[in-house]
Swiss-Prot record:
<comment type="function">
    <text>Guanylate cyclase involved in the production of the second messenger cGMP. In addition, regulates cGMP levels by controlling the transcription of 3',5'-cyclic phosphodiesterase pde-1 and pde-5 mRNAs. Involved in the olfactory, light and pheromone sensing pathways. Part of the chemosensory mechanism of the ASJ sensory neuron that controls dauer formation and dauer recovery. Promotes the calcium flux in ASJ sensory neurons in response to onset and removal of a nitric oxide (NO) stimulus and is thereby required for the behavioral avoidance response to NO-producing organisms like P.aeruginosa.</text>
</comment>
<dbReference type="GO" id="GO:0043204">
    <property type="term" value="C:perikaryon"/>
</dbReference>
<dbReference type="GO" id="GO:0007399">
    <property type="term" value="P:nervous system development"/>
</dbReference>
<dbReference type="GO" id="GO:0007608">
    <property type="term" value="P:sensory perception of smell"/>
</dbReference>
<dbReference type="GO" id="GO:0005525">
    <property type="term" value="F:GTP binding"/>
</dbReference>
<dbReference type="InterPro" id="IPR001828">
    <property type="entry name" value="ANF_lig-bd_rcpt"/>
</dbReference>
<dbReference type="GO" id="GO:0030516">
    <property type="term" value="P:regulation of axon extension"/>
</dbReference>
<dbReference type="GO" id="GO:0007165">
    <property type="term" value="P:signal transduction"/>
</dbReference>
<dbReference type="GO" id="GO:0009266">
    <property type="term" value="P:response to temperature stimulus"/>
</dbReference>
<comment type="similarity">
    <text>Belongs to the adenylyl cyclase class-4/guanylyl cyclase family.</text>
</comment>
<keyword id="KW-0325">Glycoprotein</keyword>
<dbReference type="GO" id="GO:0040014">
    <property type="term" value="P:regulation of multicellular organism growth"/>
</dbReference>
<feature type="topological domain" description="Cytoplasmic">
    <location>
        <begin position="356"/>
        <end position="1077"/>
    </location>
</feature>
<keyword id="KW-0552">Olfaction</keyword>
<feature type="glycosylation site" description="N-linked (GlcNAc...) asparagine">
    <location>
        <position position="149"/>
    </location>
</feature>
<keyword id="KW-0460">Magnesium</keyword>
<dbReference type="Pfam" id="PF00069">
    <property type="entry name" value="Pkinase"/>
</dbReference>
Amino acid sequence: MGPTCSSNFLRFANLTAEMQSLEINILKGYPYEHPTMIDMVTRSPQNLAQNLVSLLRGFEWGQVGAVLCEECYEGDELASEIYFSTIEDIFENNNIALKETVRIGKRENSVNISDAITIFEPSARVILLFLGNKLNDYTEFMTAMSMNNYTTEEYTPVIVISKNSLELTFPWKENDAIAELFDKAIIVYNNCYDKSKISSFLSSYSFSTIEETIISLQMYEGYHLLGYYLYTAITNTTLFNYVQPEKAISSMSIPGPFGEIFINSNGQRIAGYDVLVVDKSLNSNNFIMPLGTISTDKKCPDQACLNFVLNSTSSFEPLKDVPLCGFHGEICDQTGVIIAIAVIMGVLLMFIIILTTIRKCCNGSKGRSISNPWVIPFQDVRFIDLTNTEGSQHMSIQSLQRNMEEKQRLQSLARTKHIATVDQVYVLADKYVMRDKLRYDKIDINLLYQMKSHLQHDNLNSFVGITIDKASHMYIIWNQCFRGSLHDHIFTKERQRGTATRFEGLFLRDILKGLEYIHASAIDFHGNLTLHNCMLDSHWIVKLSGFGVNRLLVKWKTSGQIFTEDHTPVIKSEELHYFDPAMKKIWKNYADRNERALITPQFGKKCDMYSFGVILHEIILKKKFVEQLFDSPREEDDSVLIDDENDAIASRFPLPIIIPEGIEMHNDLIKMLENCFGSVRPDIALARKIIDTVLKMSGSLVDLMIKNLTAYTQGLNETVKNRTAELEKEQEKGDQLLMELLPKSVANDLKNGIAVDPKVYENATILYSDIVGFTSLCSQSQPMEVVTLLSGMYQRFDLIISQQGGYKMETIGDAYCVAAGLPVVMEKDHVKSICMIALLQRDCLHHFEIPHRPGTFLNCRWGFNSGPVFAGVIGQKAPRYACFGEAVILASKMESSGVEDRIQMTLASQQLLEENFPQFVCSNRGGRTIEGIGRILTYWLEGVNAGEQVKVVEFQNDLNDELSRIMKKDGELLAAATALKPKDKMTLAKEKVIAERKNEEERLQRQQTLQEALEEHEEEIEMNEVLVDEDEGEGKPKEVDLTSIVSTQMEELEDEPAGRTIGHGRLDSQASTIPDN
């Protein structure tokens, strides 16, 4: 029974075949046929292919296409889809033509898939899909079919799911719209272990995964099959076939625990799959319609065959695998169809021509003719809903509030103004409500005719006409300028431009050109000149709009024919200050014929110059002529021509004119501005001459904008240059900080995006140091005092390390770790660098006074070890360069097991020093028991020979944060530096030690005391015997180091013996390790 590991399948199959033993495969299907093997897997490639063949035959399909995603089954070790070549072979043997096979990736999007599957258009309409074990895996493909308009009337996708998951999961449960994508898709699903059949088995056992459940079910059936076969063979010996048991088993009818088991003559299990179809019209049963189960029959040459018959109760009708007229229409004769289409097109064309003719006739009868070109049929106007025209700028969260405010403004605006199209041209329509049919006299008709037909100028906006709808609304229509009005660009913050101060001359010049043309035309004067009616076209040319309209509106409002939709005044209050008070007085009394007679062409032109004065004031000073005035809706049908209260406010101006500070204005311009509001007003010619002289600008507005953009570009280049320099400076600071945190080579690799892999360094030395008594010192000091102390000490340590070629790995409180030999590889000098660092650090502490405790100095322990380590960068957001290995652990142990003011090292480091750098003086500490490592031999680093000592410049007491300089030449003696200054306490201690060591009697006495102590402590006897032997065999060095130590009380000998304070450190009882002079 087995195997239980897929990698052992062939090995077990060959072994059982050689042994002629029966093997029952329960793990996964394979495309191989092995004697003496019974394959219990329902997911084998052979069973999958036989199910598909029976389905295709049942629907009478002989040619298909396939889409395969091999990556989709990479994580599924039991998948049979990876043996697709076996499925192709079985198709070929059963005369199923596989026309095209498209292979796609696991994360292919629908756009790419839609391009790839176009290969099926000339060859296949039934497409087998092998894209995964879940229906969710097929959503992108179904979307691609929808994108290509592959309808359910043309193509049939067949989703193949060979994995038995005990229950299908439908992706449209949460979103019904997905069911439309899968509509009419056929699902071939392995449901051999239906939950209703295996419920008792599952209730008896529990499994962690579906795969484990399926394998257990197949194992259970395998044991049942074997038992049934053996039981039957005992009672019927003719069935027992020792050489080919699969032949005997295939001939049997085997009632399994979950249903009958069918084995074919090749020993492979044959089991039928379920066939389903997705139907979006079904509101129940998850949009699924069962089409039947592929049944198994033993009445065939292979002893087990599959057969599919569509359920008799199903209404599903499968499509053909080949279109009725072929893939290219080659089967059907298209001549008749072409003739029929041509006839239909001809009839439609005649109908369109007749309809167009009738429409033109109707339009002519409605007044859109040469005589009344200003009358626009309402059906020719296509209105646009401003409140629903949203662009991409409305989609961001930040603009949501602004979008809502804009909607409210547009909804209010839409009550009186509408954007529309007439003859495919965008227009703006002012809306009014009619109480009665409008009455036109000859003057009105002539005015409208002139406005429509004769007023054509570069600085005039085109008047389109007037239209009336069936709901008694009148619309006055003008061409739409989408850059808005000058009022928008001057007083609306969102549309102001910093360069607007340079454009006022061009704006005023365009206004005067248009106004001059109107004054010379048949309509004589504008009558409605405001900033709101000074429009800007796409070329930034000012076009005057609204001319002549006020004459009609005042007449119609006075006679009670019109009012506004929002019941506000016909003449908006925000525009009242543009009109001459004399003109407004006449409008209010327009019903009086004598008052109307006062509006002469000459009077109208003077009123236009008044309006121009207001515009000049607002353009030059960028300031409202009057405070903002607002209209309030009145009662229904009670709107007025002019709001008297607002008009009283507007009429208090314009005099006196006040020029704000900071704005320079030419005297001629001021004089003309004052004259515009006086009794003797300038004419157009004089106004143009003054504007052209005072605000002279060459070229058009576009030319000026190009110049401004050029100047802005040059300034922008300089700004970019300056910002780039600042950025580079900041990057340099960042790089310097990064170089402090990581080695230079590692930092450069990380900056360039190069992965820094861990690396093994065969030759490296690691040094650890730790302040003795730091915890008690912290408890007796303020936090800032501790920080100042550590900062001063580590600044000195860092400078020593940088000068000696080491690298500081980390600093944790008072603990300090230094490495040499990484990341810069050193063959042998790494141990020399560490020795120099340790000695210089020790000497530095002898002169480093605790800032907040004058006269008190720090004591440290040092320990180092040499050997192979591996190092690399840890972390991404806060990367740290760290090293690891047994050598690092042992170096840490050397520090923790050391003695204050002493430098301890391992045998490996001592041997490197002895072989390559004999100038360093070492002494044998002896064997030490190190926790977690065992007993090892350690040494003290005492110093350097007198002829090779390193000269160190004294640390200045008043420079707490910096070490001034350390001499790099090893040949200069430390004695040369100390000769220029009084002897310090360490020098006195050295002399004392030498004197004591010369005393032979004291040395013999100490040795005798040591022997007595060793007799009481067995382990210490062995250690000291080694020390005595080494002292006798190695001889005595010629020089004595500054940090040599003498013992004073041998009876206090311990792992960390007590001693007496000398200088700034502690001298311990280790006299036996110090040779005589």
